[in-house]
């Protein structure tokens, strides 16, 4: 739609294993099976996946998407908010159970003075000092990078036996055989 916009996604958390953001390398994302930006995380992530396969279990994941060169003014302050539209689209993806923009849920533990995005004039233009809002203020794009993250649940279709009931309400157990995704967030 807008040719200058560049969108890139990466897996930033596999189960309880998070990347080290200081090691972020955009080029490395396409070079590994996890779409991970942190080269140092790969060994532990492989070990985690192999362990889950052996156990017949699964884990969740967090994916981060960054959109660069988004123009100022997309969205609306009341109806048609950009953050609402993005949330609706992302939450429509199977297995997604959480969505955040910018500081997201971490903002709940911050003060307003810590979370707000202050501005200054740089090269005769208004410039943000931070991007805690993830590039969206009041439902409208601010011109900064739009940063969103979403959480994908662990799949319940696992080999590991789980308690359930049958159609006659008898207690029983279930185990899924065949294809087993240890983490659907990698897909």
Question: Where are the regions that the model predicts?
Answer:
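A structural-propensity feature for long, helix-poor, extended segments
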Residues: 9, 18-22, 28-32, 39-40, ...
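Glycine-rich anion/phosphate-binding loop at the beta-strand->alpha-helix junction
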Residues: 56-59, 63-171
């Amino acid at each position: 739609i807008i040719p200058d916009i560049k969108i890139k996604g990466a897996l930033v958390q596999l189960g309880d294993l998070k990347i080290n953001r200081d090691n972020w390398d955009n080029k490395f994302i396409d070079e590994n099976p996890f779409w991970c930006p942190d080269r140092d995380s790969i060994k532990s992530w492989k070990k985690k996946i192999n362990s889950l396969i052996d156990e017949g279990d699964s884990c969740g994941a967090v994916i981060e998407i960054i959109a660069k060169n988004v123009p100022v003014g997309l969205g609306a302050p009341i109806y048609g908010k950009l953050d609402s539209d993005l949330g609706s689209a992302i939450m429509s993806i199977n297995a997604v159970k959480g969505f955040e923009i910018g500081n997201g849920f971490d903002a709940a533990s911050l003060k307003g003075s810590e979370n707000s995005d202050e501005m200054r004039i740089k090269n005769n233009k208004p410039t943000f000092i931070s991007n805690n809002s993830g590039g969206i203020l009041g439902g409208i794009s601010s011109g900064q990078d739009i940063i969103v993250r979403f959480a994908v649940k662990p799949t319940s279709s696992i080999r590991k036996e789980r308690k359930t009931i049958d159609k006659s309400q008898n207690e029983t157990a279930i185990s899924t055989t065949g294809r087993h995704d240890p983490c659907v967030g990698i897909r």
